[in-house]
UniProtKB/Swiss-Prot annotation:
TM stretches of this protein: none
Protein name from the UniProt record: Adenylosuccinate synthetase
Pathways per UniProt: Purine metabolism; AMP biosynthesis via de novo pathway; AMP from IMP: step 1/2
Cofactor(s) recorded in Swiss-Prot or TrEMBL: Mg(2+)
Domain of life: Bacteria
Residues that coordinate or bind Mg(2+): D16, G43
An annotated GO BP: 'de novo' AMP biosynthetic process
Reactions listed under catalytic activity: IMP + L-aspartate + GTP = N(6)-(1,2-dicarboxyethyl)-AMP + GDP + phosphate + 2 H(+)
Top-level taxonomy: Bacteria, Pseudomonadati, Pseudomonadota, Betaproteobacteria, Neisseriales
One MF annotation (Gene Ontology) recorded for this entry: GTP binding
Function: Plays an important role in the de novo pathway of purine nucleotide biosynthesis. Catalyzes the first committed step in the biosynthesis of AMP from IMP.
The keyword Transmembrane belongs to this UniProt entry's keyword annotation: no
Main location: cytoplasm
Gene name of the record: purA
Cofactor note as given: Binds 1 Mg(2+) ion per subunit.
Length: 434
């Protein structure tokens, strides 16, 4: 039997590109959807039949009621956030969530001391804030690398955890009390959380790597769902204004426990303009009424944090870096409709550097990006509405010209165009599973 085709969906900018909708749409054809990195620091918003659902940890395929969903080892899991999300889905009438959700035993857990340290550190930074969501993601990844993490498998034996926990809290409380003048975390409080969640989470703990490899051998298509965006990647993003995990397509292999040869197609999700949340350099950021208009029409507020997103022109030079480090096979352009009515559109095709030189690709690291001045190409916009358009031919001529120019400058084909939040409001030029 020929192996099935598998697709990785990643955010190709600074996150918030609209991955959730596209994963939900692609899930129709999948035998499993897998989260492979990140935590509950970013929300994936789905709109089905006008009904809105925000997921943070659970893969966006969960609304398809016969579909198995997986949380791989690369994800840091807040047990309380996970159960809260399951309860929300149950209340919304989604069937058999706990029966269909499988969690790798090797997932590090986010516990109260991670959140306490994350928030205390950010408060101490003053003007040097990184823009963390304060949900404990960074400290949980630190524990993983320092080999002191409490992992999902530990929930199967909570009675053995106390000794391990005492050693961890000694480390955390020294920092909380002496570096940040914050309250210490009590072992009893952490154990209370662990005991509360262990019984419900234990049945979901599964050898995710093995199940995914078996599904692949059986010819089932798999969908790997990235969180955040490539330009927030811990290695290749605008460091230190980045997230704590690898957000690239290659991370799907390690974070889900599958070989890289199982990743057949990389779909990069790309907004028709650029946004960024929190601190960090943003060469094409707009501070005028055009930027304010994009924010308003695009509802640019974080689905989890409620934070306003910064808006700017499309940055093809930044996207080039993303295409390079992810091996993007095709792009899905989202929120094209938000550009309706913008009279003149700028596309950033490169940057001027402080030494007078030029580059056509985003440099690595925050200091280098901070000094970049965008070089723009100008195109005429369109007045007609693209909202809800379902065929490429029905798009305004200038909208098609805009998409074509993005392809030419970035060097990757447009496979899908999203013209609204509902899964039906989608134009398909090339299906990733085809």
């Amino acid at each position: 039997m020929a192996m099935a085709k598998n697709v990785v969906v990643i955010g190709a900018q600074w996150g918030d590109e609209g991955k959730g909708k596209i994963v939900d749409w692609l899930a129709e054809e999948a035998g499993g959807v897998v989260r492979f990195q990140g935590g509950h620091n970013a929300g994936h918003t789905l709109v089905v039949g006008g009904k809105k659902t925000i997921l943070r940890l659970i893969p966006s395929g969960i609304l398809h009621e016969s579909l198995d969903c997986f949380i791989g080892s690369g994800v840091v899991v807040s047990p309380e956030a996970l159960l809260g999300e399951i309860d929300e889905l149950n209340a919304a009438g989604v069937k058999n969530v706990e029966g269909r959700l499988k969690i790798a035993p090797t997932c590090p857990l986010i516990l109260p001391y991670h959140i306490a340290l994350d928030q205390a550190r950010e408060a101490s930074r003053g003007k040097g804030k990184i823009g963390t969501t304060g949900r404990g993601i960074g400290p949980a990844y630190e524990d993983k690398v320092a080999r002191r993490a409490i992992r999902a498998a530990d929930l199967l034996h909570p009675e053995k955890l106390r000794e391990k926990l005492d050693a961890i809290l000694a480390y955390y409380n020294v920092q909380l009390q002496h570096l940040h003048n914050a309250e210490p975390v009590k072992a009893e409080d952490v154990m209370a959380v662990i005991e509360k969640v262990a019984l419900r989470i234990a049945p979901m703990i599964t050898d995710v790597s093995r199940v995914l490899n078996e599904k692949n051998k059986n010819g089932e298509k798999l969908l790997f769902e990235g969180a955040q965006g490539a330009l927030l990647d811990i290695d290749y993003g605008t460091y230190p204004f980045v997230t704590s995990s690898n957000c690239l397509a290659g991370a799907a292999s390690a974070g889900a426990g599958v070989g890289p040869q199982m990743l057949d197609y990389v779909l990069g999700i790309v907004k028709a303009y650029t946004t960024r949340v929190g601190s960090g350099p943003f060469p094409t950021e707009l501070f005028d009424e055009v930027g304010a208009g994009l924010a308003e029409r695009g509802h640019e507020f974080g689905s989890v944090t409620g934070r306003a997103r910064r808006c700017g022109w499309f940055d093809a030079a930044a996207l080039k870096r993303s295409i390079q480090i992810n091996g993007i096979s095709g792009m899905c352009i989202t929120k094209l409709d938000v550009m309706d009515g913008v009279e003149t559109i700028n596309i950033c095709v490169g940057y001027e550097l402080p030494d007078g030189g030029k580059t056509d690709i985003l440099p690595c690291g925050s200091d280098a990006v901070e000094t970049c001045k965008p070089i723009y190409e100008t195109m005429p916009g369109w007045r007609e509405s693209t909202f809800g358009v379902k065929s490429y031919d029905a798009l305004p001529a200038n909208a098609k010209a805009y998409l074509k120019r993005i392809e030419e400058v970035c060097g990757a084909p447009v496979a899908i165009v999203s013209t609204g939040p509902d899964r039906e409001e989608t134009i398909v030029l090339h299906h990733p599973f085809a």
